[in-house]
């Protein structure tokens, strides 16, 4: 079975040839994995382990055009994401310190004006990840969660 056949069989409650696999890996893990396995930088961890599912996501943030790197130094980087939040990340760290939010006054969310949901820029990364998933033989899944799940990032 192909990955898509396997995943669709499982979703349809039909027996696949094996359980469809999904995992996601931090970049630091993949780098260490390549070192430990003696593999070069082109080694694809998802192909190595037979991952079947690829999650493809458009940019769900309210202001994708405002995402930017604001400052970089030897100690780290300061960025603004598409939610309007300011993040300070130390060099070599995966997690960040939140240094600011878009909605400082939590009483007035209706005043916010978001960029158009149909803007082409929101879907460029989605289309690239979809093409990559298909080329790699994985079953692509599109998801949304930003407008509902991630609005906490505004505050």
Q: Across the structure, where does each feature detected by a protein language model lie?
A:
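Catalytic cores of TIM-barrel enzymes
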Residues: 1-155
